[in-house]
Amino acid sequence: MPKMKTKKSVAKRFKLTGTGKLKRAQAFKSHILTKKSRKTKRNLRKTAYVSETQEKVMKKLLPYV
């Protein structure tokens, strides 16, 4: 049986933490920022974590990470 391939699109967007959670960046932070408040933009800088239901799917796409 051949090796499983890592989905590179997932590998570049998500990082695995020490506890096994998947860390991701927030969406809505790239453009159209003038109508967003200072507080909103500041909160979008923070990292977010993938939900437990999505985490099961994502970990199948990252077999060697």
Swiss-Prot record:
Keyword Cell inner membrane annotated: no
Keyword entries, A-Z: Ribonucleoprotein, Ribosomal protein
InterPro entries: Ribosomal_bL35, Ribosomal_bL35-like, Ribosomal_bL35_CS, Ribosomal_bL35_sf
UniProt keyword annotation of Magnesium present: no
GO cellular component: cytosolic large ribosomal subunit
Top-level lineage group: Bacteria
An example Gene Ontology biological process: translation
GO MF annotations, alphabetized: structural constituent of ribosome
NCBIfam families membership: rpmI_bact
Record family assignment: Belongs to the bacterial ribosomal protein bL35 family.
Protein name: Large ribosomal subunit protein bL35
Organism: Clostridium kluyveri (strain ATCC 8527 / DSM 555 / NBRC 12016 / NCIMB 10680 / K1)
Taxonomy of the source species: Bacteria, Bacillati, Bacillota, Clostridia, Eubacteriales
